[in-house]
UniProtKB/Swiss-Prot annotation:
Regulation: Competitive inhibition is mediated by geranyl diphosphate (GPP).
Residue positions binding Mg(2+) 1: 345, 349
Subcellular location: Plastid, Chloroplast
GO BP annotations, alphabetical order: diterpenoid biosynthetic process; hydrocarbon biosynthetic process
The protein's role, per its UniProt record: Lyase that catalyzes the formation of isoprene from dimethylallyl diphosphate via a syn-periplanar elimination mechanism in which the diphosphate-leaving group serves as a general base.
Originating species: Populus canescens (Grey poplar)
PANTHER family in the record: OS04G0344100 PROTEIN-RELATED (PTHR31225), TERPENE SYNTHASE 12-RELATED (PTHR31225:SF252)
Pfam families registered for this protein in UniProt: Terpene_synth, Terpene_synth_C
Transmembrane stretches, start-end: none
Transit peptide, start-end: 1-37
Name of the protein this chain belongs to: Isoprene synthase, chloroplastic
Record field: catalytic activity: dimethylallyl diphosphate = isoprene + diphosphate
EC number: 4.2.3.27
Binding site for dimethylallyl diphosphate: 345, 423, 486, 489
């Protein structure tokens, strides 16, 4: 098969809609000219399959998005107007946060609202100073003697920002038998705050474990008739998934709509939140145009018909991992890698023969373009696309930061492909590994380590040797979010994978290893998720080896895992709810603020 050593730039038609089903047009799209450097083009490559060789099919749902429609951000002039307005509103909110005369509870609730509305990144230093002031003046000791709501709220905010506070703060709300006081149930707002705080627990913090059980049992008993519609919506939202496990953009859009219904809403804060949400959304649209052009040029979605095309879902995932506007490079890098992972996973899981998979794994390990001579045609296409993309990412990093990261990127891919290969061997041998053997491989095959290594080089400006060495060893900040990724994925996909004949899954392996029912195995996996979350919470306390932006990115990957797999596998089989979420985050602006 011949390959062209050309760089092709083909314009994209913007006459269709992003979603193939009719949807309201939100923003007028405008064309964008983008040049991309590449060494090998895969766009005009074709291949033929061996007709006599049987290939499995997973019958995946087809892609439901139309890449011909790429939304644009507003004009530069409009963005500048928005920036000026946002700057003025931001100054007003900053004054409120820095008001040393404000009552502590008022300040804490303001900080909580700022963060829920998606504005925390604008006020990081202000919030830290305010919390420092709160702690140094004895504020935390004071609120623990006043109300459960104030105690739980301050506890959660302080732990979120790396302060070491003791679970003993809640001991004062227990009776002589060690049970939480029954009269606390009369204050739903306080119970809701206690529930949210309990998810910041560390290993061995039994008081917080008891607090969660106590809060959940009461919150589930409440009805809208008893507490009112507004509070009932908050309770249901929290019980579905706690705040600490939600992605920030989805939480922001939900919180904005909930907050604007409040009679006592801070109108300046609300206006800034809506403006900020729409401004960041315009950045996502710009990023998506760039990534979509790359995907069309790569051409894998149209050439490899057996595999899932999930670029939009991969980009949406990347927004959850790094939502801040300054992290476009991270979003694009993670989206590209997850798109590749999705297709290559299908090659290993469904389409490739074991001999072919071993050849592909060897090619990735060697990272030599000449290795394509040993590959079947469809793998040549995939390997060249991967080879070009990763080399380009490494080149850009060398040019911009002076660091050759290619060995780290290629090792991450080699490790992933070896993990995929091990799973393929289990499948071909029709063997079910023990849970320990399975999981020791599966957290790597989740692609979590790979995504986080690519994310590290995108969000960290000053790359440190010690950090890189620990990345290579898959430090806890890499492994633990990946554990959560794998466990959440397995909970959501177990039934479908069993139907496809795949023998390795956390649930099925746990059933076989422990000799228990599917129900008990599922419960055990959920407990493993909880315990891993507690271990990961410690990364924010006592100072991490890694820079804060990367720590947040790693935690966000775990959050995105919770959200993506909470009600099924929203990446493999995106449903209507998933599509609505994608549209709300990427394309549909929030209606303007009106006084």
């Amino acid at each position: 098969m011949a390959t062209e050593l050309l760089c092709l730039h083909r314009p994209i038609s913007l006459t269709h809609k992003l979603f193939r089903n009719p949807l309201p047009k939100v923003i007028q799209a405008t064309p964008l000219t983008l040049k991309l450097r590449c060494s090998v083009s895969t766009e005009n490559v074709s291949f033929t399959e061996t007709e006599t060789e049987a290939r499995r099919s997973a019958n995946y749902e087809p892609n439901s998005w139309d890449y011909d429609f790429l939304l644009s951000s507003d004009t530069d002039e409009s963005i500048e107007v928005y920036k000026d307005k946002a700057k003025k509103l931001e100054a007003e909110v900053r004054r409120e946060i820095n008001n040393e005369k404000a009552e502590f509870l008022t300040l804490l609730e303001l900080i909580d609202n700022v963060q829920r509305l998606g504005l925390g990144y604008r006020f990081e230093s202000d919030i830290r100073r305010a919390l420092d002031r709160f702690v140094s003046s004895g504020g935390f000791d004071g609120v623990t003697k006043t109300s459960l709501h104030a105690t739980a709220l301050s506890f959660r905010l302080l732990r979120q920002h790396g302060f070491e506070v003791s679970q003993e703060a809640f001991s004062g709300f227990k009776d002589q038998n060690g049970n939480f006081l029954e009269n606390l149930k009369e204050d739903t707002k306080a119970i809701l705050s206690l529930y949210e705080a309990s998810f910041l627990a560390l290993e061995g913090e039994n008081i917080l474990d008891e607090a969660r059980v106590f809060a959940i049992s009461h919150l589930k008993e409440l009805s809208e008739e008893k507490i009112g519609k507004e509070l009932a919506e908050q309770v249901n939202h929290a019980l579905e998934l706690p705040l600490h496990r939600r992605t920030q953009r989805l939480e922001a859009v939900w919180s904005i709509e909930a907050y604007r219904k409040k009679e006592d809403a801070n109108q300046v804060l609300l206006e800034l939140a809506i403006l900020d949400y729409n401004m960041i959304q315009s950045v996502y649209q710009r990023d998506l145009r760039e990534t979509s052009r790359w995907w069309r040029r790569v051409g894998l979605a149209t050439k490899l018909h057996f595999a899932k095309d999930r670029l939009i879902e991969s980009f949406y995932w990347a927004v959850g991992v790094a939502f801040e506007p300054q992290y476009s490079d991270c979003r694009n890098s993670v989206a590209k890698m997850f798109s590749f992972v999705t297709i290559i996973d299908d090659i290993y899981d469904v389409y490739g023969t074991l001999d072919e998979l071993e050849l592909f794994t060897d090619a990735v390990e060697r990272w030599d373009v000449n290795a394509i001579n040993d590959l079947p045609d469809y793998m040549k296409l995939c390997f060249l696309a991967l080879y070009n993309t990763i080399n380009e990412i490494a080149y850009d990093n060398l040019k911009d930061k002076g660091e050759n990261i290619l060995p780290y990127l290629t090792k991450a891919w080699a490790d992933l492909c070896n993990a995929f290969l091990q799973e393929a061997k289990w499948l071909y041998n029709k063997s079910t590994p023990t849970f320990d053997d399975y999981f020791g491989n599966a957290w790597k095959s989740s692609s979590g380590p790979l995504q986080l290594i690519f994310a590290y080089f995108a969000v960290v400006q000053n790359i440190k040797k010690e950090e890189i060495e620990n990345l290579q060893k898959y430090h806890d900040i890499i492994s633990r979010p990946s554990h959560i990724f794998r466990l959440c994925n397995d909970l959501a996909s177990a039934s479908a994978e069993i139907a496809r004949g795949e023998t390795a899954n956390s649930v099925s392996c746990y059933m076989r290893t422990k000799g228990i029912s599917e129900e008990l195995a599922t419960e055990s996996v959920m407990n493993l998720i909880d315990e891993t979350c507690k271990k990961m919470n410690k990364e924010k306390l006592g100072g991490s080896l890694f820079a804060k932006p990367f720590v947040e990115t790693a935690i966000n990957l775990a959050r995105q895992s919770h959200c993506t797999y909470h009600n099924g596998d929203a990446h493999t089989s995106p449903d209507e709810l998933t599509r609505k979420r994608v549209l709300s985050v990427i394309t549909e602006p929030i209606l303007p603020f009106e006084r």
